[in-house]
């Protein structure tokens, strides 16, 4: 059976201590600690939503443990350059 693509997109704002998650189009949001346990909970939150894409803004390496864990879960990931994100936001108003 062919997989039907999801229309769910998940953005993750990363800091040293936190992973703040926003889900589109549902508008859900959730926060997790940026720790081994928090990353496991993050994956448990994301997987049932079957996202088309999970997006991280590169944050000086603080995102890498979460990226590695979610990649091992075979989730579709993109790590974005913060400058490109900022330039895109400016361009779209």
What is the role of each PLM region?
Residues 1-93:
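Phosphate- and other anionic-substrate recognition elements at nucleic-acid/protein interfaces
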């Amino acid at each position: 059976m062919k997989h039907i693509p999801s229309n769910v997109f998940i953005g993750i704002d990363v800091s040293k201590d936190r992973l703040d998650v926003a889900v589109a189009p549902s508008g859900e949001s959730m926060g997790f600690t940026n720790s081994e346990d928090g990353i496991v909970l993050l994956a448990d939150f994301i997987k049932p939503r079957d996202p088309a894409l999970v997006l991280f803004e590169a944050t000086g390496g603080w995102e890498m443990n979460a990226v590695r864990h979610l990649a091992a879960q075979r989730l579709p990931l993109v790590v974005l350059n913060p400058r490109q994100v900022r330039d895109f936001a400016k361009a779209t108003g």
